[in-house]
Structure formats: C-alpha cells, structure tokens
Amino acid sequence: MAKKITLLGSTGSIGTQSLDVIRAQGYEVFGLSAHSQTDKILQQIEEFHPKYVCMTSEAGAEKLSAALAGRAGAPKLLTGPEGLKTLAAMDGPDVVLNSVVGIAGLGASLAAIESGHDLALANKESLVTGGHLVTQAVAKHGVKLLPVDSEHSAIFQCLQDKESAKSLTKILLTASGGPFFGMKTEELRGKTKADALKHPNWNMGAKITIDSATLMNKGLELIEAVWLFGLPPEKIQIVVQRQSIVHSAVQYSDNSIIAQLGVPDMRIPIQYALTYPARVPGVVPELDFTTLKLLTFDVADEETFRCLAACKKAIKKGGLGPCAANGANEEAVKLFLEDKIGFLDIGRLVEAVVDSDSFGGDYSLADVYECDRMARAFVRAHL
C-alpha cells in the first residue's frame, strides 16, 4: 500500500520539491495546504487528488472555494490557522511534512505530534520558537521527528550508528555563505533585495534566501540543531562550505569526522525524511567526484553578519530568546522585501530585540505567540 502524506505548505519551494519526490515514489497525498497561491494549489489538486485542502488566507480560501464549487470529487476545504492545525491532526497520513514558512508552522507541528503522526520538519521555526514544547511533545507521544533541512538531515544521517552517536562531541554545521560572502559592512550598506535574492547554490523561497544572505538562516539552524541533537551551542561549529557539497558533519570523541555529501538539491533530504529508514532510488543525479576540483572551508563572519551573532546570544539566553530573534527577523525581512528598511537594518533590529530582555525561563504556547508579537512590535517601533 502506498504511503500517505499530508503536505503543509505545498505551493512553496520545499512543497513543490516534496511533490516531485511524492510523484516519483508513487505516494498518495492525503492533504495539502497553502496560504494564498490558489492557482498553484488547484493544479496540485488536479494531479494528486487530496482528500483535504487548507487555505490559510481568507481571500485564498474564498477563491479556492469558488473554483472547487460543483466539482466532482473535490477535496474538503479547511480554512485559516485553525484549519491548518485540524489538517495536521487528521487521522489518515503516515507522515506529515511541514514546510510552512515561519512561526505560522508551529501550531501545525504540535497538532501533528500530539495526534501521533511522525513529523518530517522543514519548518525550522517550530524548533526555534517552541523547541521545548516540540521536543517535549515528541517524547510524550513517541513519534519520529525527521529533519528536512539539508544540514540537519546530513547530521541525522551521520548519527544513524546509535553506538557511535553516544560518542558525539561536535557538530560541524555547514553554510554556503550566501551571496555576500567575504563582504564587509560598508560593502553591504547599499545591497538591495534583488542582490540578496541571488543565492549562489540553492533554489529557495524569498524569505529563506534573504535569511541566507544575512546568515540568519544559519543562526536559526544552530538553534534547531541544539534542540534536535542535544548538544550545547558551543559544541556546534559553523563552517562556510561555498560549494554546498558537504552538507554537514559530526565529530566523535576520537576526533574522527563523518560527513554527508551530495549535490545541492533539497529533494535528497526530503526523500530521506519520507522514506526513512529506507534508502531508495530518487530523482536527484549522483555526485560525480571527478568533477569536484575544489572544496573550501571558511570561518563565518559574525562581526559583519550580526544576525548570526544575535542567534548565538539568543540560544545562550534560553527561554524565549530564540523566539524573539525569529519574530524580529520575520518582521524585518518583510520590511526589507517591501523596501522599507536597508539590508543592514535586519541584523541591527534582530540584535536589538535579543539585547532588550533576559528571555529566560519556561514558557507556554501562549507565551511564544506573545513574545513573537512583542518582537515584531519592537522592530516596527525602532525603524
């Protein structure tokens, strides 16, 4: 029987690449969700015939409802953030893949876990903003949390030898360096969104591409790695690997290092999360070592790229510190993409929010959303 998948965020970059994998493996789509891209999800409905679809924007839901009216075999339509959580919690799928962008994915991640579903997680913000809540829920409900980020998938793959994993001493978390690698503050001052959206190696959505340019993405991934693999941040070293061939590595107590390599294609980690623990042929070409002329490794420049420094401060503060950093960044990136602030303002604002409070202590889901709201308000008040 074909594996059934609920795919949240199906019209984004990760979502469409996930459907490439689902198509190639002959999996069944149980549910799909999108925010507002009605035309795109209509095409997906016609090909994959999901039983349920959720549109989280009101306008998108109204447009999709009109398009599906009277259509034979149309999926049941759910709407809004509550509809997204309902879809994530529904009985039926074998795996829920959450590729929603931003903190909007947290509630759906928790709903899937609490309903007993294995969760393939591309929404790193679930762990960044609510890592304590997510890991606690995973332990309570005994489900698998399968990383989809290429770096965390690489680390996860390197740790499959459970005996060796007990001797883990360090994670080498790789970064591409983004489009502005090697530049200093003065060179970055006039960079536009068009400049920042030119990633050298990866095909990604706008928000994560900007995060790559500021190195915020690597800061978020550092926080994510702390929650996924149980190492303190000082045991996670960020290494710039410009070719995006070495996706990350782990170091053991005897100082041996195991790395995962492959072409820079997100369908590899997506497929591994969906087929785990099996490995099967897929749609990605093999890496030809004879064509690799150079693999370089460099230090990440935290002095210039302040988002990375801010994320390190945030995870060391603990509590809601990472949530505050994430909320500030989401708001700042939105303003940057609207041409309302400059590129360097993103790092300035994220760091200012992290420095504004101690953020320590336990927290609830309501606390997470309130912290996110306050961080965004802080950004808007300090432009």
Regions found by a protein language model. Name each.
Residues 1-383:
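Catalytic, metal-anchored helix/loop core of enzyme active sites in primary metabolism
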